[in-house]
């Protein structure tokens, strides 16, 4: 509205304060969700990597985390390039509109705690995956600039609950005595996905076409959904 960058910074500051307040209010909702995991004592010695891999569902959750990071980080790093080089936005517009993805994540994380009142972790993860899928489809189909931007917001909203819910559900899937070790390899998988998958898409964008961006995301999402469903099956946590 012609007020310049100081007004923009003030608006962002107000938004951050509001979202922080919402996050603080929602914290008890996350803590209030009980799990049926065994409350075993921590093992006397740490599990080796080989022992962790032998736990039913461990490999699946690692791949799911890897693919989640692929979706989130590839979107965060390449959305602006996709908007500028394929969707028809100017460089300045693309740089600004790419932030809609982060707004989606921030708002989604703020409200994720409230979802636990009605839903458990697998349900919330599935909901997030569904929202991500809708967002990617909005990017993939030639629906116009408006729906492209809506797609970025939806991808952010869908990503928001997946990471915390996978972590939160770890004791339920693997038991309290194994959860610390499994969370460690989950985080390692997430970091590997962050380091590997965005540069891999960079090669695709440079040598083929940046238009493959939504296809790359939907393939990563498909593997994540598959691995999460396999995890639920192996851990006996299938939803009725």
What annotation goes with each model-predicted range?
Residues 173-210:
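A late C-terminal transmembrane helix in Major Facilitator Superfamily
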Residues 56-99, 103-106:
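Extracytoplasmic gate region of multi-pass secondary transporters
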Residues 123-138:
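Structural signature of the two symmetry-related core transmembrane helices
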Residues 161-174:
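Intracellular juxtamembrane helix-capping segments at the cytosolic ends
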Residues 108-120, 205:
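Helix-to-loop junctions at the C-terminal end of transmembrane segments
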Residues 7-26, 214-230:
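Symmetry-related core transmembrane helices of the 12-TM Major Facilitator Superfamily/SLC fold
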Residues 25-50, 240:
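Flexible cytoplasmic inter-helical loops of multi-pass small-molecule transporters
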Residues 135, 146-154:
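Paired small-residue
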């Amino acid at each position: 509205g012609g007020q310049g960058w100081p007004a923009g910074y003030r608006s962002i500051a107000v938004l951050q304060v509001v979202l922080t307040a919402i996050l603080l209010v929602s914290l008890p909702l996350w803590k209030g969700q009980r799990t049926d995991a065994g409350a075993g004592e921590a093992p006397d010695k740490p599990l080796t990597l080989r022992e962790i891999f032998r736990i039913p569902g461990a490999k699946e959750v690692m791949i799911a985390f890897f693919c989640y990071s692929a979706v989130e980080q590839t979107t965060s790093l390449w959305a602006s390039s996709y908007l500028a080089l394929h969707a028809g936005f100017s460089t300045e517009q693309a740089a600004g509109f790419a932030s809609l993805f982060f707004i989606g994540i921030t708002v989604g994380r703020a409200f994720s705690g409230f979802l636990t009142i009605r839903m458990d972790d697998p349900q919330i993860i599935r909901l997030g995956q569904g929202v991500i899928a809708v967002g990617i489809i909005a990017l993939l189909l030639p629906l116009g600039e408006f729906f492209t931007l809506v797609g970025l917001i939806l991808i952010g909203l869908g990503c928001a609950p997946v990471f915390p819910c996978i972590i939160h559900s770890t004791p339920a899937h693997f038991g309290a005595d194994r959860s610390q070790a499994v969370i460690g390899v989950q985080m390692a998988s997430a970091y590997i996905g962050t380091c590997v998958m965005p540069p891999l898409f960079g090669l695709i964008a440079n040598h083929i076409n940046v238009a493959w961006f939504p296809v790359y995301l939907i393939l990563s999402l498909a593997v994540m959904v598959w691995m999460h469903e396999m995890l639920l099956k192996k851990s006996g946590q299938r939803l009725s």
